[in-house]
Amino acid sequence: MKSPAPSRPQKMALIPACIFLCFAALSVQAEETSVTPQPPDILLGPLFNDVQNAKLFPDQKTFADAVPNSDPLMILADYRIQQNQSGFDLRHFVNVNFTLPKEGEKYVPPEGQSLREHIDGLWPVLTRSTENTEKWDSLLPLPKPYVVPGGRFREVYYWDSYFTMLGLAESGHWDKVADMVANFAHEIDNYGHIPNGNRSYYLSRSQPPFFALMVELLAQHEGDAALKQYLPQMQKEYAYWMDGVENLQAGQQEKRVVKLQDGTLLNRYWDDRDTPRPESWVEDIATAKSNPNRPATEIYRDLRSAAASGWDFSSRWMDNPQQLNTLRTTSIVPVDLNSLMFKMEKILARASKAIGDNAMANQYETLANARQKGIEKYLWNDQQGWYADYDLKSHKVRNQLTAAALFPLYVNAAAKDRASKMATATKTHLLQPGGLNTTSVKSGQQWDAPNGWAPLQWVATEGLQNYGQKEVAMDISWHFLTNVQHTYDREKKLVEKYDVSTTGTGGGGGEYPLQDGFGWTNGVTLKMLDLICPKEQPCDNVPATRPLSESTTQPLKQKEAEPTP
């Protein structure tokens, strides 16, 4: 006797399971068809630990990026023999057996360049090509040229690249945009996901998932052909983020997936390893030792997962904003990540429709709708009036307002009335003379006050514009651009982050000195310049007087000016 046909709601409930089971095979296949390179801390074992603990280099990333001159097993064997001999010199041993990363030549821009000219001149300076790498290099080869952030960041970074690509597109370099999308697709095919950066020690984690948005950007130039071409890789990346969901029970978490008590599926940041990060080895060990009440492996995992978030580090992840060892990234459901997952599902639906698979498109729409409901239910703080992260330990939405709260607006997942409240909260609590504060907390960490970061400025600007909040959007763009221009006028460079409590000052805090270059700042600056100035009269520098925003959707006109605040 046949079972009765399930009702429509039951059918819809089965859809996600079907997708997850089908695509889980994709991620497994990707992992099985490639040999995952081992990171230097595994290849070199005790030698790596000893070199990093000896602090031979001011930046721990230096030795993580060093290339062994011969088989690491042979180097390690030699080290074991020599290390206890009289007069052994560890620095000399390293210099003989490794090729250290070269410091890039300091770029000196031509005199008299405008801000736009400076950025356009930087694209070739920041472009790298690594089709082939040394056998034991931590650098992962990529088939096409790519643009790096700059400074100590000698490799391509995942979420940085999206904002860099916005600038490349604005400059008309669609060939470079296409190359970078192809590189990320290559990584998905080879490793099952896009790593934090193209280094072996970054393979255990990803970063905020912007690949689908990169494909959507490329589609602005190539049309639906880009969506069709990269649909398989977008599906594989989605499978990576949802890996483990098919066996998850209510109230459980598995890797990057969280299933709440009512069955709502959301995501969190996660790193597959629970050891010190090779690029910050000594710092991580010190952080773990400073809190003997927690297992070191737990702290290492949360440090790594914070790096996966892109916000390394921030009071956002900590119980005590002044103590990094209280961070617990893996027990927090981030509002920005889930907004990006919603956007990924929407783009997957669009791409599925482009290839004529309407059934699959409807399935992704169902997943996106379910996630949107989850965002509205769990990631909105009704008492405070803003979006926030959800705490898996307290089973409550957190109270802290951060710039991540603008992501639901950026991806058009926010309710209209809530977007209005977000505009008020942003202007009241985060807007500063030099742009948007990352948080309102001063912790000494780089993803806290008083630092402002280019990608968050753009997310906020675009998100607020999506909901007609143009005055606040203009405030953010103008304040940040003024900061960038003043810094450029004084130092002739763009930097990684800015102090937004004033204008004309680079940001501070964190594990390393301020870096210049800088990929995502360049990209966002170009987008904002073209936002505030009409296309028929583009500006090469930030105008001396502030354009007035309009209540309409028209571009902000340069001629309608008021005195600069």
From Swiss-Prot:
Residues bound to substrate: 152, 159-160, 196, 205-207, 277-279, 310, 511
Keyword vocabulary terms for this entry: Glycosidase, Hydrolase, Periplasm, Signal
EC number, UniProt record: 3.2.1.28
Reactions catalysed: alpha,alpha-trehalose + H2O = alpha-D-glucose + beta-D-glucose
Signal peptide (UniProt feature, chain positions): 1-30
Compartments where found: Periplasm
GO molecular function annotations of the record: alpha,alpha-trehalase activity
Residues at the catalytic site: 312 (proton donor/acceptor), 496 (proton donor/acceptor)
Gene Ontology process terms (BP): cellular hyperosmotic response; trehalose catabolic process
GO cellular component: a single term: periplasmic space
UniProt-annotated stretches for the region Disordered: 539-565
Enzyme class: hydrolase
Alphabetized PROSITE patterns for the sequence: TREHALASE_1, TREHALASE_2
Chief location of this protein within or outside the cell: periplasm
Segments traversing the membrane: none
Listed InterPro entries: 6-hairpin_glycosidase_sf (IPR008928), 6hp_glycosidase-like_sf (IPR012341), Glyco_hydro_37 (IPR001661), Glyco_hydro_37_CS (IPR018232), Trehalase_periplasmic (IPR023720)
Database matches in HAMAP family: Peripl_trehalase (MF_01060)
NCBIfam families according to UniProt: PRK13270.1 (NF009773), PRK13271.1 (NF009774)
Function: Provides the cells with the ability to utilize trehalose at high osmolarity by splitting it into glucose molecules that can subsequently be taken up by the phosphotransferase-mediated uptake system.
Family stated for the protein in its record: Belongs to the glycosyl hydrolase 37 family.
Subunit structure: Monomer.
Protein name, as recorded: Periplasmic trehalase
Organism: Escherichia coli O1:K1 / APEC
